[in-house]
């Protein structure tokens, strides 16, 4: 009986994992799997935006190779910080089903903050010249 239940659950979870993004209505996510799936999508979107802003900062400052190198080093250090910090958030909530959501939310928040910092420091001007890219939104 236990094997049958385990097989049924495995089949269900596998199907949910392969169902694709359209299978989950993130505005009405109802269970931990759906909520975590939607949080992962939000993190992925934030990461894509960060990558876009980093690429623009590299291109915008291409003539200053020292600056581009420094941004890249800072980005690697930031990634290490974000990972270890959000891993500690996961550990804080390790005994609850909310642990995954808390860690994903932590990563999303820090990623959006990092995107804003990249924009503010490397894609804007001190005068009234419009920025290279629009100001990214922080988490609400």
Language-model segment annotations:
Residues 1-4:
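Positively charged n-region of N-terminal signal peptides that target proteins for export
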Residues 8-9, 120:
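A periodicity- and composition-biased signal for non-globular, repetitive helical segments
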Residues 12-16:
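N-terminal signal peptide c-region/cleavage motif recognized by signal peptidases
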Residues 18-140:
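N-terminal alpha-helical modules
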């Amino acid at each position: 009986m236990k094997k049958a239940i385990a097989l049924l659950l495995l089949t269900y979870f596998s199907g949910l994992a392969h169902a694709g993004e359209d299978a989950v209505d993130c505005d009405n996510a109802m269970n931990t799997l759906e909520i975590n799936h939607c949080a992962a999508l939000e993190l992925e979107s934030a990461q894509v935006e960060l990558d876009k802003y980093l690429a623009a900062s590299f291109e915008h400052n291409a003539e200053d190779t020292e600056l581009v190198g420094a941004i890249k080093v800072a980005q690697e250090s930031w990634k290490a910080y974000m990972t270890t910090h959000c891993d500690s958030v996961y550990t804080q909530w390790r005994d609850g089903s909310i642990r995954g959501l808390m860690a994903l939310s932590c990563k999303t928040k820090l990623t959006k903050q990092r995107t804003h910092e990249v924009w503010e420091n490397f894609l804007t001007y001190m005068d009234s010249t419009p920025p290279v890219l629009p100001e990214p939104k922080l988490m609400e």
